[in-house]
Amino acid sequence: MWTYISWQGKHRFLALTEKFTTGAPGYVETAHFEPAEVDPKTLERIKDVVTKSLDALGIEYGASHSELKVDEAGNIGIIEIGGRMGGDCIGSDLVELTTGYDFLEAVIDIALGKEPKEYERREQYAAVRFILTKDDMDIYERIKKNNPELIIKEDVHEISGDPVTQSGDRSGYFIIAGNDKEQIRKYLPD
């Protein structure tokens, strides 16, 4: 998933998010990780596709959230180009944690007719993991016990035991962040 901010028709790439799901049939999102890894050539090709798509759709101001798929042959398919912030803690939390850019402030500034501020980019790793199962809860408890400094935000509830077939069935989430990519990635779904 690709996050951009636009001002006067100029599109600034902010973040690339890796998405984890349950797979078919529901594709319920289980986690997101930033920054996602992609080779530099593919990164530039996708930036070009997203920028041209934003132009074609007439998106000149504000946030945008784009979902694309790159197949094994390198073909890029557009799933969604939306004039909105990414949900599930992407726009509200992960972008700022991984880049240092106050995305929410920028969106508000643009809505008020003010140019968004420049920023000094920082590199950090962050993830949101959703609670769907007892295993997810066990991972949350293990982090809370052994690495509580990684937890940035949490909203965790008792697991109902019912199958999770949509995002609204999840029993909460926790956000972790740090400078060690592998330390964050090890808490993501396989």
Residue positions per predicted region:
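Active-site "cap" helix and flanking loop/linker of ATP-utilizing ligase/carboxylase catalytic domains
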Residues: 45-66, 72, 82-135
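Pre-DFG segment of protein kinase catalytic domains
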Residues: 78-80
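Peripheral (often C-terminal) accessory segments that flank ATP-dependent C-N-forming ligase machineries
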Residues: 106-190
